[in-house]
Design a protein with these regions (language model features):
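Catalytic cores of nucleotide-sugar-dependent glycosyltransferases that transfer UDP/GDP/TDP-activated
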Residues: 1-174
Length: 174
């Protein structure tokens, strides 16, 4: 999110009649604190965002993000916990909290879901076959992850270790 900050600040300066909004799903310094195995939420109240940015060599990203949060017309975030992170690390609570999540009807129901799942599986196997230069069977187990790649914060380390454990399990037949 911090990457949009310069644009938002520029628009605010160059075209002040255009309203600016900045939404963060997590602060860059918060991600860095957690990614460096420091306890983010246990000690959130004790962290100084500017000091942590210096310690973790994140001054540029943090500075842009902090200035953007303070100077856009509307600063938003996606949860109460992220708002607490913004208050502590950016010295600015969100103007509005836009709750994260999906509507109940986001996932299709019944035969619509089954059809979409089958088509998606066929496409994934097709891509895998082309990438690997092989012909994987229809019963191939497909395991995947999506989203932002953050080795610790998003649990990629746990995901890979779990796959390794499954791979070594002699009781599994797939």
């Amino acid at each position: 999110e911090w990457m949009t900050g310069m644009g938002a600040l520029y628009v605010q300066e160059a075209v002040p009649e255009v309203a600016t909004i900045f939404t963060t799903h997590a602060t860059s310094i918060g991600r860095s604190i957690a990614g460096n195995n420091k306890p983010l939420y246990d000690y959130l109240f004790a962290y100084n965002g500017d000091q942590m940015a210096q310690e973790l060599n994140m001054q540029s990203k943090h500075s842009i993000e902090k200035q953007t949060a303070h100077y856009v017309d509307c600063f938003t975030t996606v949860s109460e916990i992220t708002n607490n992170e913004c208050k502590e690390l950016l010295d600015k609570p969100a103007d509005v909290i836009l709750m994260n999540g999906f509507e109940d009807d986001f996932v299709p129901k019944g035969s619509t879901f089954t059809g979409k799942r089958k088509r998606a599986r066929t496409l994934m196997l097709n891509v895998a076959n082309k990438l690997l230069g092989t012909n994987l069977g229809d019963d191939t187990l497909i395991v995947g992850t999506s989203g932002r790649y953050e080795f610790k914060n998003k649990g990629i380390d746990v995901f890979l270790e779990s796959l390794n454990s499954l791979n070594r399990d002699t009781n599994l037949h797939k």
